[in-house]
Design a protein with these regions (language model features):
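RNA-binding accessory domains that recognize and position tRNA/RNA substrates
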Residues: 30-222, 238-278, 288, 310
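Short helix-capping/linker segments at secondary-structure and domain boundaries
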Residues: 143-155, 306-314, 421-432, 478-483
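Class I SAM-dependent methyltransferase "Motif I" SAM/SAH-binding loop
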Residues: 226
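Hydrophobic/small residue at the entry helix of a nucleotide-binding pocket
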Residues: 231
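ATP-dependent adenylate-handling ligase core
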Residues: 249-387, 391, 403
């Protein structure tokens, strides 16, 4: 049996097969979980050696973090001195917004294009849009800030009061928690958005107080974020059943999202986001890279879209499971891959909109009272979408899909979709959807154990909670259709599965959520 070994040293890790054949290289991103996953997939025993144990140690010993602090000098030649929010611009003639940033003199321009956008004639709505665009500029900056992790953040002419500073500090710290964990960084003493209470007039000449005193008179219809998976389709159908006028919208060019919306017999607004090419060059040159809270960025984009197109409600399909932390790092700090899908972010973002943009446009997740399995149960009955949807994230990348089919059949998202759907479908029906029986494949057992929190880290993916994964597996253990499948038989031996709770199939509308009263009234009447 071959061995996998790794040599770690400051700045770079190099994996070698049999100590002579290079498999891949990582720039400050190689961690023990990565190695464990690689070894598991390739059925290899794991042996790790360290050239400099003071830089990196395996989990369970002592995990040193590279501490970045705003009061310290730049470290390692990779850290920037200043990250600036240089400005933003919108051209009503083309529907193109430009967001400009500066990293130590390096200019980065991001472009957002809103198709066939009518420019609002109402001055208050124009002002609200520019406030929303300013918020988008601040939120989207996280994609560029992470590359240099600058000691100083210069917000330029942006309006930063204490509530906005608190929102941004939490978003950048929590939204980059996974990025920091993977790169072994401590950002707690680094990120600091300073208060700037100067209420600079926006382009209409109105102050913030003037803006908030004028109602926008937006129609009570919903702009619904679409992701191509089951959650957004359930959300869309619930609103339609409740008699709410809906408009599906997505960010990016995914063909699959277009197909799911077409199946719903609705038009799709497709907003394009073009990242700065300079960021790619920086990443190629060894800049820090990793996960960013994309849902936060898309939320800000759709807020702008709601004001341009005239929608009172900006609706996402984030469920209660997104509140669960993925893991705790070596310092006991929670790391949530889904932070920007969590209730905490939803509440913070809604409060910022009300205070800094307008109380007349409302942002919320319709599915917050639902567990993942409760959503899946509803979707299992929406058979018309079974042949067109996909939950596999390899379909949805900034640079396009990375698979030819709808399902890669070997990732946490594919596995969780199988686990969540199986209690409500026959093996043949699930095979028809995914093109494989993942629950009957020996090489999938380790991945399903991770979903259930059985001796493995929960994956850094948008999957259900450990409790509901265990409850779903327990359901399969007791189901004659599924109990003889290989993975089900293996996991049935674990006491955690035997002791799991029941599937939570009903929404809990008594729990905290942000669904507006007017929408709740329609839902209750449907």
């Amino acid at each position: 049996m071959s061995h996998l070994s790794a040599r770690m040293y400051a700045g770079r890790g190099h994996i070698k097969w049999n100590n002579d054949f290079p498999i891949t290289n990582y720039a400050n991103q190689l961690t023990i979980p990565h190695l464990r996953t690689f070894a598991t997939v390739h059925h290899l025993p794991l042996r790790v050696t360290f050239q400099n144990p003071t830089i990196f140690r395996p989990r369970g010993v002592t995990e040193p973090y590279l501490i970045l602090n705003k009061n310290s000098a730049p470290v390692s030649g990779r850290q920037a001195t200043c990250f600036s929010f240089s400005g933003y611009h919108y051209d009503p003639a083309t529907g193109e917004a430009t967001l400009t940033y500066n990293v130590d003199g390096r200019i980065l321009n991001e472009k957002i294009t809103f198709p066939w956008t009518p420019w609002p004639v109402d001055a208050s709505r124009q002002a609200a849009f520019f406030r929303a665009l300013e918020l988008l500029h601040l939120v989207a900056g996280i994609s560029y800030y992470k590359a240099g992790l600058a000691i100083r953040i210069d917000t330029g002419n942006s309006n930063i009061d204490s509530s906005m500073a608190e929102f941004l500090n939490e978003l950048y710290l929590e939204g980059l928690a996974e990025f920091a964990y993977v790169n072994k960084l401590d950002l707690t003493g680094l990120i600091d958005f300073e208060v700037n209470t100067d209420d600079t007039p926006v382009s209409t000449g109105q102050s913030l107080d003037d803006l908030l005193s004028h109602p926008l008179d937006l129609p009570g219809r919903a702009l619904v974020a679409m992701g191509g998976g089951k959650d957004s389709l359930v959300c869309l159908q619930m609103l339609r059943d409740a008699g709410v006028e809906v408009q599906p919208v997505c960010v990016g060019g995914s063909r699959l999202i277009g197909e799911t919306v077409k199946k719903a017999n609705l038009p799709l607004i497709r907003i394009q986001r073009e990242l700065s090419g300079e960021l790619t060059e920086m990443n190629t040159g060894g800049a820090w890279n990793g996960h960013v809270p994309v849902t936060a960025i898309n939320s800000a984009i759709l807020l702008c879209a709601g004001l341009l197109y005239g929608y009172r409600y900006v609706v996402f399909a984030n469920e209660s499971s997104a509140n669960e932390a993925t893991l705790k790092d070596g310092r006991g700090r929670e790391v949530n891959h889904q932070y920007s899908k969590s209730l905490a972010f939803e509440q913070n973002f809604a409060a910022v909109i009300e205070r800094h943009v307008s109380p007349d446009i409302e942002y919320f997740s319709l599915l917050r009272p639902f567990s993942e399995v409760a959503i899946t149960r509803r979707f299992s009955e929406m058979t018309e979408f079974h042949e067109v949807f996909s939950s596999c994230n390899r379909n949805f990348h900034q640079d396009g899909p990375r698979i030819t089919g709808r399902w890669c059949q070997d990732c946490p998202k594919c596995r969780f979709a199988a686990l969540a759907l199986a209690p409500f479908l026959s093996p043949q029906a699930l095979f028809t959807i995914q093109g494989a029986d993942l629950l009957d494949q020996e090489n999938q057992a380790q991945g399903f154990k991770a979903l259930c929190g059985l001796g493995e880290f929960k994956p850094f993916e948008c999957v259900g909670s450990i409790a509901e994964s265990r409850a779903a597996m327990k359901c399969l253990v007791n189901d004659p259709q599924w109990q003889d499948k290989y993975v089900v038989r293996v996991l049935a031996r674990y006491p955690e599965i035997e002791q799991a709770g029941v599937l939570e199939l009903q929404p809990d509308f008594e729990a905290t959520h942000c669904i507006p009263a007017a929408v709740m009234t329609r839902l209750n009447a449907s």
